């Protein structure tokens, strides 16, 4: 299988962590795709140009970190991250959806902040900064929720990648104002799968 990524993509990092946690590293070739450029050869593989993108052994192509993670998790017939049925599963989906919303907003903020100053939209920067702070304030209050504790699950993986991405955004400071999140993130970052996939600093 071939997994196409961008080294700095938090969405690709989610899948890379699942690959490591599921001990699939020898079966999944990780390939850095050239994205956001004209006429990249990658567009012949994935016309959307997005990452992550998985080409399965049978040629099936999958896009979206949640879909790819679920596929990889079920390959051995013993899923580690599958959600339970009924109310517990609904609660996990609810929390994961809001965590992904946090990541989505930070991704917009990051892209905007990495533009040259004269190309940035102050309105977008303000809107996404305020959204991020609201959500991080919420998670600071709820970090002791059972889904953020105990055995590794998708909520923890996605949230760890979210906070890791937040660290890279210029002029966005969250650690000092969210000490519980800072402590949680430091513990999560010590996992080998997180250490191995730590994103590079933006150029």
Residue positions per predicted region:
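GST-like domain detector, emphasizing the conserved glutathione-binding G-site
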Residues: 1-123
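Hydrophobic/aromatic-lined pockets within catalytic cores
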Residues: 73-77, 167, 171, 189, ...
